[in-house]
């Protein structure tokens, strides 16, 4: 077990705080999450289930070659975040802020227990006549960890070790972060423990939109994100800036988004629609959900301000458009290619 941290303006300090209250854990369980240890969680992805029962797949399979049925969707920080984003589909009204759990579970424990939790959630599909036996057996042995799901995963202070534990087991890894913990990325760079693909979710083109859409719980969130984007530039791993676009809220100023993207110069940019699902329905309306055509038009406007980038692909079921840097090999794998090297 490890000590805890609490994020503070400009630095991270140690501070005592109780573990996740049982009423919060029970709310997650009702939403079909498996609680892992003191502060982590696992949930079967919508597209994993669709892949097993219908042969459909997530846009990440089309864009990057990640097999949806072999993806483990987890988070080491289930109920803690630095933002209160209006579009979040998680039950963030019960989130516990930025005062984090004590003590921390070890990375090895989290990885092993997350795999067990995934299998517990999968077992009901074993006898399903719609599920191919071979595909189920592959799903039983996940090979890709999507470290996102809920909360802000980079608040976990041993993220580099967590990534390393997954890699030891032959996993590829994605981390999806809101970019407010740049010191964690600095540590991972120094330790040479980067994920296979690092996402930062940028959901505002300027600080005014950031304050109204992301509703930060820390006073220097925007400055932290700017630092994170600078750190991403030229990282020796795959990098993505994801724009979650909410009609009537943050779907404006493509030229300002472009300036932020060029700070990081990622391999990929994903322009993706907000989806009217989960708890976000308590805060927004279906009119806030862009159509795929809306996303396509925004991506076309955005790429005009992104020299060295082009629209590479799109996936209408997920309402997402992939923008790619011109020097990325469209048929290649690894850190210089479009596809993940397994």
Curated annotation (Swiss-Prot):
The keyword 4Fe-4S applies. Binds 2 [4Fe-4S] clusters. Binds 1 4Fe-4S cluster coordinated with 3 cysteines and an exchangeable S-adenosyl-L-methionine. It catalyses: N(1)-methylguanosine(37) in tRNA(Phe) + pyruvate + S-adenosyl-L-methionine = 4-demethylwyosine(37) in tRNA(Phe) + 5'-deoxyadenosine + L-methionine + CO2 + H2O. It is found in: Cytoplasm. GO terms for biological process: tRNA processing. Its cofactor is [4Fe-4S] cluster. GO terms for molecular function: 4 iron, 4 sulfur cluster binding; metal ion binding; tRNA-4-demethylwyosine synthase activity. Keywords: 4Fe-4S, Cytoplasm, Iron, Iron-sulfur, Lyase, Metal-binding, S-adenosyl-L-methionine, tRNA processing. PROSITE patterns: RADICAL_SAM (PS51918). This is S-adenosyl-L-methionine-dependent tRNA 4-demethylwyosine synthase. It comes from Pyrococcus abyssi (strain GE5 / Orsay). The lineage of its organism: Archaea, Methanobacteriati, Methanobacteriota, Thermococci, Thermococcales.
């Amino acid at each position: 077990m490890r000590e805890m941290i609490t994020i503070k303006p400009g630095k991270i300090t140690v501070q005592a705080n109780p573990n996740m209250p049982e009423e919060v854990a029970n709310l997650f369980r009702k939403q079909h999450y498996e609680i892992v240890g003191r502060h982590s969680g696992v949930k079967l992805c919508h597209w994993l289930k669709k892949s097993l029962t219908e042969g459909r797949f997530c846009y990440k399979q089309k864009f990057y070659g990640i097999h949806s049925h072999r993806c483990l969707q987890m988070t080491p920080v289930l109920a803690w975040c630095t933002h209160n984003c209006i579009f979040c589909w998680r039950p963030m009204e019960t989130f516990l802020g930025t005062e984090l759990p004590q003590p921390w579970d070890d990375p090895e424990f989290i990885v092993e227990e997350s795999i067990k939790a995934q299998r517990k959630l999968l077992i009901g599909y074993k006898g399903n006549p719609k599920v191919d036996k071979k595909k189920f057996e592959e799903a039983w042995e996940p090979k890709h960890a999507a470290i996102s799901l809920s909360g802000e995963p980079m608040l976990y202070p041993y993220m580099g070790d967590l990534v390393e534990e997954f890699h030891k087991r032959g996993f590829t890894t994605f981390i999806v972060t809101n970019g407010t913990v740049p010191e964690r990325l600095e540590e991972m760079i120094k330790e040479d423990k980067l994920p296979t693909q690092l996402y930062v979710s940028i959901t505002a083109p300027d600080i005014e939109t950031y304050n109204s859409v992301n509703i930060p719980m820390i006073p220097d969130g925007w400055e932290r994100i700017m630092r994170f984007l600078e750190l991403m530039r030229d990282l020796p791993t795959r990098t993505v800036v994801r724009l979650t676009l909410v009609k009537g809220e943050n779907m404006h100023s493509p030229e300002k988004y472009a300036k932020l993207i060029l700070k990081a110069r990622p391999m990929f940019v994903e322009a993706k629609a907000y989806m009217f699902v989960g708890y976000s329905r308590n805060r927004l309306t279906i009119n806030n959900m862009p159509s795929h055509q809306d996303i396509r038009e925004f991506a076309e406007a955005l790429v005009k301000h992104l020299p060295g980038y082009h629209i590479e692909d799109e996936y209408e079921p997920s309402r997402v458009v992939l923008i790619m840097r011109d020097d990325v090999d469209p048929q290649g794998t690894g850190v210089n290619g479009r596809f993940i090297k397994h």
